[in-house]
Each structure stands twice: as structure tokens, then as C-alpha cells.
């Protein structure tokens, strides 16, 4: 309401997104606290978490689509026309979007230390109804949940072995192609390992 009062509604960008799929932890962690306060913590158990992410596989803490494919809503009346898009975006794109819109520059140094340019591609072309050149690859890591997507191909590791899926033909990740395409699986898996090393991250 305040934005409307200021006459800035048409030129204000509002984004809403979820950070992961439904939470599979056991429910009633804080049964005596009603939902809402910071002290409350509501979860829905494995079964309902899986159902909540239908038709996608799995849930939060995994890098299957049920854990990482989430809603993203952007509202900017002066720029965005109502509609939907199937173009792929990622949380890393949010910073790049704001920097393009505002003209802000990412600092080359912070506290005297050189920085790496942050990953991400601006979502502004998508907001304007254009086709954006997609990411070459997108990477994920959460503890022992690992994945990298290249176009419509995606490798996922939930344990020791990498799995390969064609998201265009199989968005629910039910047909593991790793044995049929071992070279591609190994190629993408090595790309993830190289990225992980570059990030200086060690799996737990």
C-alpha cells in the first residue's frame, strides 16, 4: 500500500521465490507454538513432502527436481507483462538482475581482498518477454546432495554414484541414463568436481 501511496507501484520490482522443496523432517517439532512466530518450526514428514512436490522427485535437502525446482514470481507492472515462462533461472541470477537494473558494480576488492565476479545472469531479458541465452551449466551442492545441469541433461549424486537424467524427456527423473551414457555422465560429474574444487568446498 505504501508503494502505491508514493506513486512507485509501476516502477517497483517485487520478487517472491522459495529456496527449496517441501521439508521432509518429522512434523510437530514445536507442537506447543502456533505457526508464524520465529520460534515455531513446521515440517510435514517425508511422505507429505514428496506429495507436496508432485510431480517432481524427492524434496528439500536433495538435488532432485523436487528439492530444487521451486516457484518464482516477479511483479513489475511497468516492465513485466502477465504470463509465465519456462526459461530456467537460478537464485544466482537475482544479484545480476539487480545490478543490471540499478547500474551497480560488484566490488573488485572487499576489505583489501580481491573478489571473484559472482556467477549469475540477469533475468531482465526474461522480464521483458525476450529469450535469454541460457546458462551453460548450473551447479548445486547441499552436504552430500550434488548436481549439475547442462541444457536438458542433469547429473545427480545422492550417495556414491552419479545418476544422469534427460529433463526434457523425463522431468520427474525416473529413468537413470548413467549406464546408457557413461561418458556423458562422467563428463558432467567431473565438471561438478572441478567446480566444487574451485569453490574450495569439501563435502561433509
Predicted segments, located by residue:
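Histidine-centered active-site microenvironments of extracellular/periplasmic hydrolases
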Residues: 2-75, 79
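Loop/turn elements at helix/coil->beta-strand transitions in domains of secreted/extracellular proteins
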Residues: 8-14, 133-135, 150-153, 184
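C-terminal cap/loop subdomain of S1 sulfatases and analogous C-terminal strand-loop tails that border
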Residues: 38-65, 79-87, 91-168, 195-204
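C-terminal structured subdomain/cap of oxidoreductase catalytic cores
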Residues: 167, 177-185
